Curated annotation (Swiss-Prot):
It comes from Danio rerio (Zebrafish). Gene3D superfamilies: 2.30.30.1150, Zinc/RING finger domain, C3HC4 (zinc finger). This is PHD finger protein 14. Zn(2+) 7 binds at residues 710, 713, 740, 743. Zn(2+) 8 binds at residues 838, 841, 861, 864. Interacts with histone H3. A zinc finger (C2HC pre-PHD-type) spans 348-381.
């Protein structure tokens, strides 16, 4: 049977298209060569097969067509049409000769495929071969579909009787072809799941028919000749790149990824296809706003509202799976828009359980709105229909939970006590937070489906939540928020006006239906007794009040809300209660007024008592001053009598001729050094009589309990007179003491020298910045405001008289000049203070590892101290003495006490004989 007879049996274009679309790929194995005489081209590789057939019989096509026309009685018009078809096949052959030559150099796998293709056209081109006629062969109908005269997807869509929805097994491919290049496009979308049309790596085709290998060797030479002869004309034919199909992606991902070109141009175009598909796939990833999951399955699909763009699982929202669950963007076969309950009712709801305004809502039986996630996680919330999660019932929950706890995760503290807060499910944890706040931080969890738990929804705080689960949930939440912000704008741009009008019309129908059902449904049951609820627990009320304050010009920032959870005061009564129209708040308000009256009366009584005590203190101070004057007179008389007694005692010793022991009465009393115990520490009584000390700054002697002794200058200061003022007494330890700011300023030069040895000067510069600025102008001022009297002693002069002689005082009458000279004299020896040797171990050292005692002036290593230290025990504002000096001072105090006791005993013995 020659080629001309086959050409006469070519079907019309419409019939060929219907045959191609109704074709079932599962019947390939039963299709014989003899049954395929009705079609000439192929669907997937018709261009290639046609080119190879024309290459095998390019010289005798016209003769064979004429002979067949004479035998069958075809008229001249039919012969002319067949000759035109011959010319078209020759053009197709020339356009694909380069691809055929490239396949020849592809390896053994390519040669097998070409051999099979040559064996397919061998029964058509040479009918004289007995082996081919005697043995029928199978062929792949997907590779030999009728050749279509369409080059782009748009031309197919223009046909009235074509429906792209039903053609799930067909997709045009792209490639640089001319003329009938659409046959190459059909190859990718023809439902082909094997690798027959790939680069030549098909092993299944060889296994199906082993006899094809013998024919491959026989016909390989013919293919080589035809491809080599046509390769010269390949450069003259321009190529066109077919338009890329950017339709909805579906489950044909494997076909798209496995379909490869047979030329370099097709390879480049196919490399762009997976990238485009992956970018489209990433753009369509949806996240459920209830569980934050992104897994969408057929049984539980993620659907999206066509109005507000919110995304949710069907199971998470209680969609029944009927027509209302089909959404235009959720499935490629869906045509009905879907809307959430809030959009159906045409409201912008506010949740009653939390301050968040995002997410998806459900309506309560009382006409309020709550988040679905809030209704699932808040204890006490019930559903009328468990499967559909509606309506939500809030009456079963105790109303005392509203505003009872403060949310620890709220971004705006003004909404921290709105709604209902849940607690952390980790044992005795006392963390409370809103459900949506916990969802924002990724703290919500849900038990697995196989676990049988009464309440499968639980939440943990940041401390007890799993770090990895929290991380991916937090990312999904942020991705969901960013997607919701841009989804509406993108959808409006992508939708056509007709689709937008269809969605708007459908939404109006839903809203009319919802309005009708709202008016006809029975009224929900509510308890007879009205339950009070704090107004401040409603987030919507707080927003309206804030808006009112803004319109009135009142700033809400100047009224900070004190939400500290202090349940009771010192006397056991509640310190603060949220304002509400309840009996508890009324009782609290009345009790607070009574307490305020009592406190005010107490303040008046304390003021009167203070005035009375101050008047008594003034009288006592006057008596004290008189006693001090008499004490000075008695001390002078006592000194004179002591000197006379000593002279008489020495005279008596001279008369006796031997040295007599001077009695304790005639001995001059030693000046007792004030110890650290005299700094006002309670519970330590001294043998000396109590004295009233005056402040070194204000020169007043009131508030003796607030006077602090400086261990360097031995002056007392009020805590409030210091710079900066102190709020409590400084702590004095065993080996440290306290000094005032001016003494510390003078002794800080030693620390500055040590700081200079550090590698960086950060601490030194910081030390210089911290120095008090108010003392610098006093030292640098050239003229003093008021000359100081020589006998007086002020705060600025308390260290001048310690290291200055009388000659310097005569030479420098002005105190300001003495101050400058004294500071110079004091700094010189401290600048030369270099510590080189440890007193304990006699080892070398420097200022970085040695510390000097402020009394004995000896140096010690930090590690040689008892106990050893890692850093200097000298702190800023405090001095330091070694352990030996501290022990010796305590021994001196004990010896002095013993001596005083002995003096008292001798005095008592001398008074007895009298």
């Amino acid at each position: 049977m020659d080629r001309g007879s086959k050409r006469r049996q070519v079907k019309p274009l419409a019939d060929s298209l219907l045959d191609a679309l109704d074709y079932d790929s599962s019947d390939d194995s039963d299709f014989k060569v003899g049954e395929s005489s009705g079609s000439e081209g192929t669907g997937n590789g018709s261009d290639e097969e046609g080119s190879k057939e024309s290459a095998a019989g390019s010289e005798s096509d016209s003769d064979a067509a004429a002979a067949s026309a004479d035998e069958e009685g075809i008229d001249d018009l039919e012969t002319k049409d067949l000759n035109q078809e011959d010319d078209e096949e020759e053009k197709v052959k020339e356009s694909f000769s380069e691809e055929t030559s490239s396949k020849e150099t592809g390896g053994s796998s390519r040669s097998r495929k070409k051999g099979e293709k040559s064996s397919d056209m061998e029964p058509n081109g040479s009918a004289t071969t007995e082996e081919n006629s005697a043995e029928p062969k199978k062929w792949n109908l997907r590779r030999n579909r009728p050749m279509l005269d369409f080059t782009t997807m748009e031309e197919l869509n223009e046909m009235d009787d074509y429906d792209s929805e039903d053609d799930n097994d067909w997709r045009p491919t792209q490639g640089k072809k001319k003329g009938k290049a659409s046959s190459g496009k059909e190859k990718e979308g023809s439902g082909e799941e094997d690798d027959d049309d790939d680069d030549g790596g098909s092993d299944e085709e060889d296994n199906e028919d082993d006899n094809d290998d013998d024919d491959d060797d026989d016909d390989e030479g013919n293919d080589d000749e035809s491809s080599s002869s046509d390769s010269e004309e390949e450069g003259k034919k321009p190529k066109k790149k077919a338009g890329k199909n950017t339709g909805a992606f579906d489950e044909e991902e494997t076909n798209d990824s496995h379909s490869t070109s047979h030329g370099k141009g097709n390879e480049d175009s196919l490399l762009e296809r997976p990238q485009t598909w992956s970018s489209q796939r990433m753009e369509h990833i949806l996240i459920c706003c209830v569980c934050l999951g992104d897994n969408s399955e057929d049984a539980d699909e993620i659907i999206q509202c066509d109005n507000c763009g919110v995304t949710v699982h069907e199971g998470c929202y209680g969609v029944d799976g009927e027509s209302d669950s089909i959404m235009s963007s959720a499935s490629e076969n869906s045509t009905e828009p879907w809307f959430c309950d809030a959009c159906k009712n045409g409201v912008s709801p506010s949740c009653e359980l939390c301050p968040s305004q995002d997410g998806i809502f459900k309506e309560t039986d009382a006409g309020r709105w709550v988040h679905v996630v809030c209704a699932l996680y808040v204890p006490g919330v019930a559903f009328g229909d468990i499967d559909k999660l509606r309506p939500v019932t809030l009456t079963e929950m105790n109303y005392s939970k509203y505003g009872a706890k403060e949310c620890s995760l709220c971004e705006d503290t003004r909404f921290a006590r709105t709604g209902v807060c849940i607690s952390c499910d980790a044992g005795m944890c006392r963390s409370f937070f809103h459900v949506t706040c916990a969802q924002r931080e990724g703290l919500l969890s849900e038990a697995a489906a196989e676990e049988d738990i009464a309440d499968p929804f639980f939440a943990y705080c940041k401390q007890h939540a799993d770090r990895f689960d929290r991380k991916w949930k937090r990312k999904n939440y942020l991705a969901l928020q960013s997607y919701c912000k841009v989804s509406l704008q993108e959808r409006e741009k992508q939708l056509t006006p007709e689709a937008q009008a269809r969605i708007t019309t459908r939404l109006q129908q839903y809203r009319a239906k919802a309005e009708l059902s709202r008016n006809t449904r029975p009224q929900a049951w509510v308890p007879r007794e009205k339950l009070p609820r704090p107004l401040t627990s409603s987030a919507s009320a707080i927003r309206k009040l804030m808006r009112k304050a803004e319109l009135m010009g009142i700033s809400t920032d100047i009224f900070p809300v004190d939400t500290s959870d202090i349940s009771a005061s010192v006397d056991g009564r509640r310190k603060h209660k949220q304002p509400a129209l309840t009996a508890d708040f009324v009782n609290y308000y009345l009790e607070r007024n009574m307490r305020m009256i009592q406190i005010q009366d107490n303040i008046v009584e304390q003021k009167n008592l203070k005035d009375k005590l101050e008047s008594e203190q003034e009288k006592l101070h006057m008596e004290y001053d008189k006693l001090c004057e008499s004490l000075e007179d008695l001390q002078n008389v006592n000194g004179q009598l002591r000197t006379e007694g000593q002279s008489i005692w020495s005279m008596m010793g001279g008369i006796v001729g031997q040295k007599l022991n001077v009695p304790a009465v005639l001995k001059a009393p030693k000046e007792r050094k004030p110890s650290k115990k005299e700094g006002g520490s309670p519970g330590k009584s001294s043998s000396l009589p109590a004295m009233l000390y005056s402040c070194g700054i204000c020169k007043k002697n009131q508030d003796q309990h607030l006077l602090l002794l400086c261990d360097t200058c031995k002056l007392h200061y009020h805590l409030g007179c210091l710079d900066p003022p102190l709020t409590r007494m400084p702590k004095k330890t065993k080996n440290s003491y306290w000094q005032c700011s001016e003494c510390d300023q003078a002794s800080s030069d030693e620390a500055d020298i040590a700081m200079e040895t550090l590698p960086d000067g950060t601490k030194r510069s910081r030390r210089q910045i911290k120095g008090p600025i108010k003392f610098i102008p006093q030292e640098m001022s050239p003229e003093p405001k008021k000359p100081q009297v020589r006998g007086t002693r002020t705060r600025g002069q308390k260290r001048k008289r310690m290291s200055i002689c009388e000659e310097e005082k005569m030479e420098e009458p002005l105190p300001r000049e003495r101050r400058q000279r004294q500071s110079t004299l004091q700094k010189k020896p401290k600048a030369d203070d270099t510590r080189t040797e440890c007193t304990t171990c006699k080892g070398p050292g420097d200022n970085e590892n040695l510390v000097r005692c402020d009394e004995c002036r000896l140096c010690y290593h930090f590690g040689c101290l008892d106990p050893p230290l890692k850093k200097s025990p000298k702190q800023t504002g405090y001095g330091w003495i070694c352990q030996e000096c501290d022990t010796s001072s305590s021994k001196e105090e004990e010896a002095q006490e013993v001596e005083e006791e002995s003096v008292n005993e001798e005095t008592a013995e001398q008074e007895i004989p009298d």
